[in-house]
C-alpha cells in the first residue's frame, strides 16, 4: 500500500498506468463519504490507457488519516496540491466528483499552480438554500443507520481503518462543510486562468435546480460546460463511454500550455467553425496535431507557438493542390455526413464553386467558396476543374434566373430539370425567345428567355432594386419550410434572406446568427429589405441566441420562412393584425442592413 505524508496526514493513494515523459498525470478526487476506489474503480483503469492516474483517499476517508478530526474543502484542496507535489509532479489534470468536484474547484481557485486542467463534476461554487435545507437530514447518522442500510454498511466497510464508529463523525463533519462552503463570487471565478470543463447531469437533484454547473462555467474565463440530458448525479458511471470521450477530448485540446494558448487564440480569432475549422493541438511530446482549414491558418499556428514543434503532423484541409469544382446540377444538398439520411446543413446552386477536400465513394466533402460552408455532396454533382476554369466560367455568367423555377430542356426538347431562382448562368446565345445555357460540364440546356434577367439589368441594393426584388420573393409565399433550403423547392429562414440578397449581387453569411453579427445595425424603423432578427435569451447567462431572420416589407409587415407555418409566410408586429405573433414581437432583436 502506498502512502504519502501531506500536511500532517497520511494520504493513501493508488496509481494506474505508467508515467509518461512531459505529460501531467490525472488526479481523481472522490465524493462525500466515499473513497478513491469506490468512486473511480471503473474509469481509472480506462484512463490509464493514455495517462498515469493517481487515485487517493481524501484525508479522513478510507485509509487516509485525519489527525485533527477536521473536514474542510480548503484543507482537502491543500492536500491535493501537496500530494501532487509530493509525488514529484508540478501539475495534474484534476478531476473531482460531487464533494470531490468542490475540492477540485477550490484547488483551482486557491492552488492554480498545480492545475494543468480542471474538471469539477457536480460541484457548487456557492451554498444554495436547497442544500442547507436538504442535506442535514440526509447526513444524519441515526437516519443513515435506521433507513439507509446499504449506505450504512458501505460507510462501515470503507472507513473501518479509521475506527468502528468513525463514520458517524465523518458524516457530521461532511454535512457541516456542505452547508457552509464553498462561497465563491463571480469575481472569484473570473480570476481563474486554467482550462476548466464543468460537468453536471441535467437531472442532478443536488446541483441542477440552481444551475451550479452553468454558474461556474459562465464566470470562469474560457470555461466549457457539458450538461448531458437525462443524466443525474454520477455522470461518469451513468454514461461512462461518453464521459471518457469528453474528458479525453478536453485534455487533448487543452491539456498542455501550448495547446491552451492555441485554444485561446482560436476563441479570439476562429471561434466560428462554420467559417473554417481551426483545431490545432500540441501533444505533451511536442508533436503538432489536429486540423486547420488552410495553409494561412497553419502559418498562424506556427506563429502562436513559442517553440517550433518537434514534428508537424497538422492536417491542412485546403492547399494549393486541393481540387476545384463547380456545382453541375441545378440544386445539390450539402449534408453534415456522407449519407442521404444525414442533416442537410445547406444547399448549393448550379455554377457555385467549391474546393473538394475529400472523396469517399459516392460522396465528397466540399467547402463552398461563396459562404465558406462545408459539408458532404454527391460526387456526381461536381464538375472537377481548375481554378482558372472556375474563374472563366463564373466570369462568363451573364444572366440570372428570375423565374421561380426555370424549366430546362435538352437538345431533343425534353424537360430535364428546373433551375431555381437566383441561379447565375452562362447564356451562349438566344433565338426566338429561347436562351441556350452552357452548363459547367459543357452541356447545353434551353430555357425560356423570359425566365432570365441579363446581369446588366439585375437589381441592385438601391431603393428601386430592393422593391423589385421584394416583389419577386413574395411569389414564394406558401413554399414549404426546408431546413438548409436556399431555393423555391424549400427555404429555411436564413436561406430565404440570403437568396433575397444574392439576387441583387450581395453575398451574406449563411446562418441567421452570422448575419446578425455581420450586418450594419439599423437605427430606428427598418426599411423595406432590411433583415429582422429574433432569438430567445439563454437562461443560463442572459445572452441572446439569434435563431431566426425575416425580410422587412416596410412598416410592421415582414416575410419569412418559418416553422410555425411550415413555410414562407407573412407576419406583422401590429398587435391588431390577424398575422401578429407574440413570440416574434417579444423576441425581436433588431434589424441589419447589407449593401
What kind of feature is each model-predicted range?
Residues 327-353, 398-427:
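Beta-loop motif signature
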Residues 192, 198-200:
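Short beta-strand/loop motif that positions the catalytic acidic residue
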Residues 9-63:
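Conserved HGGG/HGGXW glycine-rich cap/lid loop of the alpha/beta-hydrolase fold
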Residues 506-567, 573:
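...with weaker cross-activation on analogous glycine-rich loops/strands in unrelated enzymes
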Amino acid at each position: 500500500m502506498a502512502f504519502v505524508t501531506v500536511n500532517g496526514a497520511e494520504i493513501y493513494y493508488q496509481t494506474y498506468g505508467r508515467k509518461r515523459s512531459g505529460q501531467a498525470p490525472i488526479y481523481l478526487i472522490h465524493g462525500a463519504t466515499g473513497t478513491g476506489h469506490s468512486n473511480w474503480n471503473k474509469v481509472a483503469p480506462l484512463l490509464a490507457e493514455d495517462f498515469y492516474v493517481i487515485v487517493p483517499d481524501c484525508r479522513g476517508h478510507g485509509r487516509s488519516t485525519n489527525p485533527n478530526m477536521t473536514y474542510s474543502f480548503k484543507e482537502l484542496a491543500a492536500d491535493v496540491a501537496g500530494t501532487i507535489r509530493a509525488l514529484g509532479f508540478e501539475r495534474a489534470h484534476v478531476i473531482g466528483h460531487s464533494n470531490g468536484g468542490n475540492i477540485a474547484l477550490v484547488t483551482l481557485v486557491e492552488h492554480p499552480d498545480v492545475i494543468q486542467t480542471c474538471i469539477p463534476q457536480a460541484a457548487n461554487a456557492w451554498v444554495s438554500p436547497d442544500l442547507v435545507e436538504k442535506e442535514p437530514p440526509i447526513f444524519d447518522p441515526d437516519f443513515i443507520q435506521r433507513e439507509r442500510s446499504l449506505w450504512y454498511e458501505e460507510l462501515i466497510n470503507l472507513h473501518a481503518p479509521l475506527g468502528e464508529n468513525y463514520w458517524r463523525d465523518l458524516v457530521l463533519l461532511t454535512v457541516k462543510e456542505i452547508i457552509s462552503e464553498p462561497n465563491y463570487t463571480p469575481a472569484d471565478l473570473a480570476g481563474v486562468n486554467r482550462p476548466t470543463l464543468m460537468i453536471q447531469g441535467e437531472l442532478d437533484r443536488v446541483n441542477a435546480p440552481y444551475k451550479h454547473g452553468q454558474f461556474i462555467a459562465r464566470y470562469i474565463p474560457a470555461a466549457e460546460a457539458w450538461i448531458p440530458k437525462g443524466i443525474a448525479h454520477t455522470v461518469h458511471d451513468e454514461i461512462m463511454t461518453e464521459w471518457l470521450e469528453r474528458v479525453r477530448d478536453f485534455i487533448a485540446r487543452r491539456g498542455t500550455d501550448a495547446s491552451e494558448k492555441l485554444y485561446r487564440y482560436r476563441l479570439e480569432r476562429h471561434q466560428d467553425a462554420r467559417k473554417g475549422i481551426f483545431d490545432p493541438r500540441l501533444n505533451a511530446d511536442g508533436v503538432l496535431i489536429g486540423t486547420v482549414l488552410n495553409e494561412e491558418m497553419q502559418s498562424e499556428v506556427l506563429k502562436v507557438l513559442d517553440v517550433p514543434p518537434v514534428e508537424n503532423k497538422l492536417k491542412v484541409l485546403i492547399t494549393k493542390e486541393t481540387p476545384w469544382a463547380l456545382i453541375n446540377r441545378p440544386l445539390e444538398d450539402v449534408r453534415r455526413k456522407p449519407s442521404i439520411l444525414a442533416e442537410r446543413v445547406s444547399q448549393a446552386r448550379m455554377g457555385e464553386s467549391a474546393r473538394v477536400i475529400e472523396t469517399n465513394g459516392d460522396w465528397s466533402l466540399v467547402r463552398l467558396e461563396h459562404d465558406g460552408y462545408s459539408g458532404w455532396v454527391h460526387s456526381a454533382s461536381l464538375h472537377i476543374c481548375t481554378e482558372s476554369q472556375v474563374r472563366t466560367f463564373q466570369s462568363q455568367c451573364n444572366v440570372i434566373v428570375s423565374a421561380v423555377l426555370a424549366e430546362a430542356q435538352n437538345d431533343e426538347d425534353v424537360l430535364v430539370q428546373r433551375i431555381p431562382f437566383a441561379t447565375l448562368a452562362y447564356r451562349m446565345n438566344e433565338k426566338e425567345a429561347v436562351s441556350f445555357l452552357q452548363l459547367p460540364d459543357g452541356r447545353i440546356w434551353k430555357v425560356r428567355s423570359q425566365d432570365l434577367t441579363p446581369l446588366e439589368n439585375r437589381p441592385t441594393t438601391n431603393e428601386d432594386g430592393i422593391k423589385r426584388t421584394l416583389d419577386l420573393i413574395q411569389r414564394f409565399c406558401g413554399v414549404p419550410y426546408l431546413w438548409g433550403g436556399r431555393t423555391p423547392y424549400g427555404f429555411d429562414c436564413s436561406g430565404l434572406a440570403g437568396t433575397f440578397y444574392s439576387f441583387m449581387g450581395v453575398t451574406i453569411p449563411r446562418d441567421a446568427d452570422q448575419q446578425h453579427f455581420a450586418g450594419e445595425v439599423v437605427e430606428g424603423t427598418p426599411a423595406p429589405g432590411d433583415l429582422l432578427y429574433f432569438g430567445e435569451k439563454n437562461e443560463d447567462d442572459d445572452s441572446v441566441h439569434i435563431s431566426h431572420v425575416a425580410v422587412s416589407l416596410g412598416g410592421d409587415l415582414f416575410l419569412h420562412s418559418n416553422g410555425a407555418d411550415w413555410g414562407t409566410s407573412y407576419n406583422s408586429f401590429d398587435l391588431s393584425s390577424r398575422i401578429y405573433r407574440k413570440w416574434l414581437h417579444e423576441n425581436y432583436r433588431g434589424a441589419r442592413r447589407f449593401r
